Regions:
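Glycine-rich anion/phosphate-binding loops
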Residues: 18-33, 59-68
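Glycine-rich phosphate-binding "P-loop"
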Residues: 88-105, 180
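Hydrophobic alpha-helical segments within soluble ligand-binding/sensing domains
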Residues: 65-75, 102-120
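A beta-strand-loop signature enriched in Asp, Gly, Thr, and Trp
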Residues: 164-167, 173-186, 190
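Single conserved hydrophobic/aromatic residue that forms the stacking wall/gate
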Residues: 1-7, 11, 184-194
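Short, glycine-rich nucleotide/cofactor-binding loops
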Residues: 15-24, 177-182
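Short, glycine/charge-rich flexible loops or terminal/linker lids adjacent to PRPP-binding catalytic cores
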Residues: 5, 52-58, 101-111, 127-173
């Protein structure tokens, strides 16, 4: 079909490729093609929002890559964006277009209610995820904890030590993180159970 004067959705699935930059570019090219074919409205669906951890400057002269991604999609012609479980809520404010932030949390809540019998502790792997862990724990009537990390600011993605803050003894500990790339900054089950 031509797509002319129709609403179009452009969904990016990263599962086929490990190269996020290529995947972004392919979706931008699809958006551009839809725009040039006179699509009425274009919605970009990004299940995982690329570069979402770079939503602010951590050091001087760093890019705000998550903002740049939004700008690129808008420049290509996107009228609406959809993503799932954003790293931070503020990403929605990077564009003036509608931005739907969906969550998969109900699926996980149902799963753990069915599979886990006994007391639970929801552990955030960092202080920044405590709000997410608290919401999750409320649905499971669980305790909340988090992992305090000691880092070397000069070494990217490396943690020197982990300390668990909260109750985990004699409980099922569920480590709740929003993005796990290489596991360099996440504690192991052994670290959490100490």
């Amino acid at each position: 079909q031509s797509g002319r004067r129709q609403r179009q959705m452009c969904i990016r699935d990263r599962s086929h490729s490990g190269d996020i930059n290529r995947t972004i570019m392919e979706q931008l090219l699809m958006v551009d093609a839809l725009k040039r074919a006179s699509a009425k409205r274009i919605t970009a669906v990004l299940p995982f929002y690329p570069y979402s951890r770079q939503d602010k400057k951590a050091l001087p002269r760093e890019p705000i890559s998550a903002r740049l991604i939004s700008d690129m999609y808008v420049a290509a012609g996107v009228d609406r964006m959809v993503s799932i479980d954003l790293h931070t809520q503020q990403i929605q404010g990077f564009v003036d277009q509608p931005f739907d932030h969906l969550t998969a949390m109900p699926l996980f809540v149902d799963y753990f209610k069915e599979k886990v019998d006994g007391p639970i502790s929801i552990i955030s792997p960092d202080a920044g995820g405590v709000k997410r862990a608290t919401i999750f724990a409320k649905h499971l009537e669980a305790y909340v904890g988090f992992v305090h990390k000691k880092r070397d600011p000069k070494v990217h993605n490396e943690v020197k030590s982990f300390t668990v803050i909260g109750e985990v003894e004699d409980r099922h500990a569920i480590l709740l993180d929003d993005i796990i790339c290489l596991l360099y900054t996440s504690p192991s089950p052994r670290d959490v159970s100490r």
